[in-house]
Regions:
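Alpha/beta enzyme core
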Residues: 2-271
């Protein structure tokens, strides 16, 4: 008989304790029940239903087109899969920039309808009022600084951020503001490793890096990228932990051959 352990679920409080203990935090994106189940069983700490689903799942060039309802739909499956991991849902572009009231309304909608544990927002001081209102309303918030893909048109690309002193100082300032506002964690994307280390030491909440060196409190990657499913995409910060694109293509090729040859299904596979 299996016994469900009530305290086995990851929580924001446990993440903070992990930082205090010097224990690294592992986070990956996930967009569906099947893969999320495997990743959760492997012991991941955080499952992020990223708006990168706009690229990975929907084939869009940018993250901008995906909607709140689409994010909720994807997150529901991941939540059903997660027996251990904390599930965080990205708030998509346009869902928190219009007004503080609109931001809180959308954040609550995401939590209520998807069942996720928290939301993630991109930006610093400019979205601080919205973040404060969300946290006051009881919504756990993860921040995101550095390269913020929803601002790709403003930045003009996906290059390294905070290289210059002024931008680095602003990023550190923003991180402190997010921490003071009550964000339970902050993602730092594609910034110099030395700056990421400085931010990690300066804030009390866990800092998760992607392309931000190894001195952050944890790391995050897009699942499909680290599994080698997205052919031709290999930025400097990405490590392939598997090469599944060739595995999938070989399996499909073999399936096609067996169908064409009428060797599948065979007698043992037929009723």
């Amino acid at each position: 008989m299996s016994v469900h352990v009530q305290n086995s679920r990851m929580t924001t409080a446990k993440l903070r304790q992990m930082k205090m203990n010097g224990e690294k935090i592992a986070m990956l994106t996930s967009y569906d029940f099947t893969l999320a189940s495997l990743v959760d069983e492997a012991g991941i700490d955080i499952l992020l239903v990223g708006d990168s689903a706009s690229n990975v799942v929907c084939g869009n060039q940018y993250t901008l087109p995906i909607t709140v309802d689409e994010m909720i739909f994807l997150t529901k499956g991941v939540v059903r899969a997660a027996q251990h991991a904390l599930v965080v849902c990205d708030m998509p572009f346009g869902s928190y920039q219009i007004s503080e009231e609109d931001a809180v309304r959308n954040a609550i909608k995401i939590l209520k309808e998807s069942g996720c544990d928290a939301v993630k927002l991109e930006g610093g001081e400019e979205i601080l009022p919205a973040i404060r209102h969300m946290i006051q309303a009881g919504v756990p918030v993860m921040g995101h600084l550095g390269l913020t893909p929803q601002s790709v048109n403003q930045f003009g690309g996906y290059g390294l951020r905070a290289k210059e002193e002024a931008e680095a100082e602003k990023l550190l300032h923003d991180a402190k503001l997010l921490d003071e506002a009550g964000c339970f964690s902050i993602v730092l994307e594609k910034i110099p490793a030395a700056l990421a280390a400085k931010v990690t030491q300066a804030v009390s909440c866990p800092v998760i890096g992607i392309g931000a060196g190894n001195q952050c409190d944890g790391q995050v990657l897009v699942l499909h990228d680290m599994l080698g499913l997205n052919q031709g995409f290999k930025p400097k910060f990405l490590r392939h932990f598997a090469s599944l694109a060739s595995v999938v293509k070989d399996a499909v090729s073999e399936y096609i051959t067996t169908v064409k040859e009428s060797s599948f299904p065979n007698a043992e596979e037929s009723y």
